[in-house]
């Protein structure tokens, strides 16, 4: 497995750590593939009863590494584009979050620092999210002329009101842990989120694994009805945006730290 992601085990709990701290665990292609591979590996592990998902260094995940944008654009223009289903009902990028939503075992995200863009969607793939009170969140894609396309349109809708989703998606504004808690994106706040997540994971691991897995499947099956179609529509929307004039202007303006000049 790539050194971008590590898996350690404490009793029957797996600790999955994003390990690119010098980039605030930003998502490049190697990181994306490593996250998905970690989920696929743990899905086969009957000895693992709960999973903790965390990030090394000062952030959980700062979102997409802009240096990877050319590869993203290339994927959009390839045969099948984003709508090609390569990981069950998801494409590779959606699988970053959906692999955890679909994991048989419960997943607890321990979140700190920043949870932006793809990192925010990754966090939403967890069953439970425990955040440091000082964490900052954002659906960052709007800043780059894109839409959330890593399962966000499925995962946000099971947690928050539609008007809240619209607000944070349209504006790409940064919001606080208090807002994230009030809006339903975060389960609880803790000054020591990793320790709290590990303690909860150990508690869950002490319950019947058959009952816990069955409960997760039952909850997911009822709350994610119709999500297959939503993932396809999410991919179509992103595919239509990537590489277009306004999307490229959003990226260039962001990198050059100037106001964007969009065409109608």
Language-model-detected regions and their locations in the chain:
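C-terminal long alpha-helix characteristic of the crotonase
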Residues: 21, 130-135, 177, 183-232, ...
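Conserved CoA-thioester-binding segment of acyl-CoA-metabolizing enzymes
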Residues: 1-56
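Glycine- (often His-adjacent) and acidic-residue-rich active-site loop
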Residues: 55-99, 226
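CoA-thioester-processing core
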Residues: 95-104, 110, 116-170, 183, ...
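Terminal low-complexity tails and localization/encapsulation signals of metabolic enzymes
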Residues: 252-264
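Glycine-rich phosphate-binding loop at the start of an alpha helix
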Residues: 63, 90, 94, 117, ...
């Amino acid at each position: 497995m790539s050194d971008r992601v590590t898996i350690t085990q404490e009793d029957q709990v797996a600790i999955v750590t994003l390990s690119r701290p010098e980039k605030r665990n930003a998502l490049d292609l190697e990181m994306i593939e490593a996250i998905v591979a970690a989920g696929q590996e743990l899905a086969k592990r009957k000895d693992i009863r709960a999973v903790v998902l965390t990030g090394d260094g000062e952030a959980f995940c700062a979102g997409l590494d802009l240096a990877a944008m050319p590869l993203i654009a290339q994927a959009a223009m390839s045969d099948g584009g984003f709508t090609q289903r390569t990981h069950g009902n998801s494409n590779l990028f959606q699988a970053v979050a959906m692999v955890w939503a679909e994991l048989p075992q419960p997943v607890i995200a321990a979140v700190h620092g920043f949870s932006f863009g793809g990192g925010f969607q990754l966090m939403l793939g967890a069953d439970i999210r425990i955040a440091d009170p000082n964490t900052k969140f954002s659906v960052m894609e709007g800043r780059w002329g894109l839409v959330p396309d890593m399962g966000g349109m499925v995962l946000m809708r099971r947690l928050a009101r539609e008007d809240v989703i619209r607000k944070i998606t349209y504006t790409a504004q940064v919001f606080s842990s208090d807002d994230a808690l009030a809006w339903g994106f975060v389960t609880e706040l803790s000054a020591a989120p990793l320790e709290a997540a590990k303690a909860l994971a150990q508690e869950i691991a002490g319950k019947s694994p058959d009952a816990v897995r069955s409960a997760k499947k039952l909850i997911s099956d009822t709350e994610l009805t119709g999500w297959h179609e939503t993932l396809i529509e999410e991919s179509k929307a992103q595919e239509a945006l990537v590489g277009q004039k306004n999307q490229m202007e959003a990226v260039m303006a962001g990198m050059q730290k100037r106001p964007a000049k969009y065409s109608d």
